[in-house]
């Protein structure tokens, strides 16, 4: 991925380092930035109690009223493991504002080159315990984003994140299309209602429609070694609810009813080569029309540049496959008289795909281990042993002849802990058989990970998915 810098300039720098003397205890400093086109304005302030908050307006019309920011953490032994609320008793150390305008080249997508134009505000804060936390805002022409950053510091080497207090208090109540987080499968029916009538958890992305006919989109970007966010509503405010770790986690132990959401090692080198850690970006896209909402590039601009050096193997495609017959009851995943993933069926599907312009054919149920996969504790899946009626050599030869990819399927039944030890062997087997595309599956609300029983969207789950991606990239 290539980057092409355009003019980059700093504007109104109060200070460039966050270790300067306090600007004043619990005053009400106001810092304002505007989007590059001037239509959006963001204001950061501290209350008299040292509570960080922000507000957002568009052409002088309020969109977000002052909304809460911050986190609750349990710090390591350097501060006696105490619970610290980084949502009050904060002092402003410094701010830094920069204007950025760059163009970068995508691996693939609707556009080859994407412009990243935004104004960035970094707010450096310090809690009364001495712990420092930065909040970084980015204001685009079609929305805003922010994230929390913890500089490397002696007082904060390892810590637990207990809560994130990011909130969105809307000046005008929007309606939202949502499904609850508790479904865990993203397969519930989307319901539209005013946010004040949303009484369950919400998954992101969350699409909003405002009274003036404009639209919004709440989601996150750059999710790395962190739990995925969920949301919940109270009146006209949307709050953040991080996916918690479960008590069986081997990542850490704790006492009490409240489970932490993440364990952070703040001493590890970051991608920039320095210690420190950051949360994912929290983003709100704002557009006048739905097509503009879809066309926004904020999420892509917030994700870090691709770290995979050779991206030639990453190719999007439309595909068909053997899977829906299982849901209809006309086929089975396991071997039987109606087994779906057979040599004959794959041959028929591949010929159809070649005739009609599809790039690949997915084969669910090609490998051994499906006999008891729906049981609470599934048997061990084999990712390098096909069923006897699935001749993988003849199928992959046909795949090469027709120019249609065979898409391998690695269903885990939620047993990520059994899948991870097989990753290298499973992907080596796929590569040896000229299988360049693999679909993974986690059909379980709670997955067995190397960190114990965890929610799919937990920090442990995110770590597992990253390991799979890194193995595939090798």
Regions found by a protein language model. Name each.
Residues 1-30:
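Bacterial Sec-dependent N-terminal signal peptides
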Residues 30-308:
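N-terminal accessory beta-strand-rich subdomains and adjacent acidic, glycine-rich linkers
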Residues 127, 139-141, 172, 287, ...:
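Short, flexible loop/turn elements at secondary-structure junctions
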Residues 148, 353, 441:
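Conserved, mostly hydrophobic/aromatic
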Residues 165, 205-207, 215, 350, ...:
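Short amphipathic alpha-helical segments and helix-helix/interface helices
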Residues 263-265, 347, 359-369, 373-374:
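Intrinsically disordered, low-complexity acidic regions
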Residues 270-351, 356, 360:
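An acidic-aromatic substrate-binding cleft motif
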Residues 364-474:
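Aromatic- and carboxylate-enriched substrate-binding clefts and catalytic-loop regions
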């Amino acid at each position: 991925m290539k980057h092409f810098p355009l003019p980059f300039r700093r504007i109104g720098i109060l200070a460039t380092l966050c270790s300067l003397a306090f600007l004043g205890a619990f005053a009400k400093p106001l810092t304002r930035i505007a989007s590059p086109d001037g239509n959006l304005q963001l204001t950061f302030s501290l209350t008299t109690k040292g509570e960080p908050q922000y507000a957002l307006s568009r052409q002088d019309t309020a969109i977000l009223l002052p909304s809460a920011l911050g986190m609750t953490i349990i710090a390591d032994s350097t501060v006696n493991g105490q619970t610290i609320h980084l949502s009050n008793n904060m002092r402003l150390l410094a701010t830094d504002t920069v204007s950025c305008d760059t163009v970068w080249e995508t691996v693939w997508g609707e556009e080859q080159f994407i412009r990243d134009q935004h104004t960035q505000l970094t707010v450096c804060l310090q809690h009364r315990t001495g712990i420092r936390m930065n909040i970084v805002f980015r204001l685009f022409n079609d929305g805003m984003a922010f994230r929390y950053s913890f500089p490397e510091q002696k007082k904060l080497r390892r810590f637990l994140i207990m809560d994130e207090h990011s909130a969105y208090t809307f000046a005008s109540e929007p309606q939202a299309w949502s499904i609850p987080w508790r479904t865990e499968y993203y397969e519930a029916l989307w319901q539209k209602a005013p946010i004040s009538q949303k009484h369950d958890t919400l998954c992101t992305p969350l699409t909003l429609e405002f009274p003036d006919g404009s639209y919004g989109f709440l989601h996150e970007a750059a999710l790395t070694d962190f739990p995925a966010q969920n949301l919940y509503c109270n009146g006209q405010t949307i709050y953040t609810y991080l996916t918690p770790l479960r008590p069986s986690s081997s990542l850490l132990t704790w006492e009490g009813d409240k489970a932490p959401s993440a364990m952070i090692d703040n001493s590890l080198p970051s991608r920039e080569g320095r210690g420190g850690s950051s949360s994912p970006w929290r983003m709100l896209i704002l557009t006048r029309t739905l097509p503009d909402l879809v066309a926004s590039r904020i999420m892509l601009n917030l994700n870090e540049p691709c770290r995979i050096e050779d991206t030639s193997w990453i190719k999007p495609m439309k595909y068909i496959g053997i899977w829906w017959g299982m849901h209809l009851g006309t086929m089975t995943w396991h071997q039987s008289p109606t087994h779906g993933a057979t040599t004959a069926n794959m041959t028929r599907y591949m010929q159809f795909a070649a005739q009609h312009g599809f790039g690949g054919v997915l084969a669910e149920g090609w490998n051994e281990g499906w006999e008891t996969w729906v049981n609470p504790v599934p048997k061990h899946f084999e990712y390098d042993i096909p069923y006897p009626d699935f001749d993988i050599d003849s199928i992959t030869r046909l795949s090469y002849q027709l120019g249609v990819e065979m898409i391998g399927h690695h269903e885990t039944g939620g047993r990520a802990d059994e899948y991870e030890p097989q990753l290298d062997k499973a992907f080596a087997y796929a590569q040896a058989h000229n299988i360049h595309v693999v679909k993974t599956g986690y059909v379980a609300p709670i997955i067995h990970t190397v960190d114990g029983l965890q929610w799919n969207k937990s920090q442990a789950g995110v770590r597992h998915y990253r390991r799979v991606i890194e193995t595939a990239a090798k």
